[in-house]
Amino acid sequence: MKRSEINAIMRDASDFIRQSGFYLPPFAYWTPADWASKADSAREIVESQMGWDITDFGHGNYEQDGLFLFTVRNGSPENIKTMSGKLYCEKIMIVDVNQRTPMHFH
């Protein structure tokens, strides 16, 4: 996907989420300079794989086969072993009208 397509999907999703009465965390809107200046804060975000995720499942046609996700919270498998910390994930998922999300697994 082209960066311009990804940016447009992110803008549309952000608008839709706000219109639905939900607000993404501040890191959703950080610039590259923000990420650089907040390296300590950013470590958990990166290690927990939180943030934007836009996929066409490798099919090359997001409008037909795609999914938008924003991960707000994500636990670690280590937390399950100790039954402490974040034990679940919290994701916002958007599928457009007539868009398919192929069966997949993680």
Task: Show where each model-derived region lies.
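Conserved short histidine dyad/triad with adjacent acidic residue
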Residues: V72-E78, I92-H106
